[in-house]
Amino acid sequence: MISVIIPVYNQADKIGRCLDSLLAQTYRDFEIIIVDDGSTDHLDEVLLDYELKLQKAKIPYKIIVQENRGANAARNRGWNESQGDFLLFSDADIFWRADALEKLVNSLMRNPQASYCYSSFRLGRKKFHLWPFDPERLRREPYIHTSALIRRQDFPGFDNAIKRFQDWDLWLTMLEQGKGGLFYDDFLFTVAGGGRISKWLPSFAYKLLPFLPQVKKYQEAATVIKVKHRLPYDPK
C-alpha cells in the first residue's frame, strides 16, 4: 500500500484539485494522510466535503490537525500515522496524472535496488525535465523534489530543524546511508501556478536570479545543507 501524505497550511483553495487527482488514480491500493499544520482558512470545511467522497470511493484516510510546526514536522507526523509500505509526500498544490501512482510503484517493484522513484513535473504550463539519478550531481545541486515514491523501510525521516531544501537534505541523508533513487522519465504531476514560486524554483535559477530576495534566502539555506553534509561551499 502507498501512503500519500499531504501537509497543508492555509491552502483550502488548492487541496481540492489535489484530492480529485488522487481519487482518479488507476492504482487503488493507497491511503491518504492529511496533516493540517495549523491552518486559519476554511480548510476544515473543504475537507469535510472530501471526507464523503473518500468514503464513497473506499479510500482509507486520516485528517490530523496540529499547531503550526512547519512542513517537515507535518510530514513526519503523517509518516508516523501512516501504514503503507511506500510513502509519497504530496504538497496540497500538486495534482497528479491519473496513472502516476501506478507508474511509480511499478518502477520500484521492477528495480529493488532503488529506494525511491521520482519524475519530471510541470509548474503551471512550464515543463521541468529532470535528470537520471546521479550521486555526484545530487551532491552539487538539489534537482530531486520531495514528491518521490519512497520505500518505507529506507525512509529516515525529515530533519525538523531544516526549513528550506528539505528535499535535498533528505536525499543527501539517504545517499550517505547507501540508498539511491530511480528516475521515471515522464511528467507525472503538475504544481499549480500562482503560488509561492520560490518553493518550486529549479536549482539553476538560484544562480541566474540572485537579485530576488527569496533566491538569496535559498542560497543561504543551501549553505546550511552543504555544511551539514560536508559538501564544498563558498563561505562568502
Describe each model-derived feature in a short phrase.
Residues 2-14, 18, 25, 35:
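A conserved hydrophobic helix/loop-capping motif in glycosyltransferases and polysaccharide synthases
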Residues 87:
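Short aromatic/hydrophobic "clamp" motif used to bind/position activated sugar donors
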Residues 164-172:
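Acidic donor-binding loop at a coil-to-helix junction in glycosyltransferase catalytic cores
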Residues 99-131:
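Conserved donor NDP-sugar-binding/catalytic core segment of glycosyltransferases
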Residues 1-3, 31, 169:
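Cell-envelope/extracellular polymer assembly enzymes that use nucleotide-activated donors
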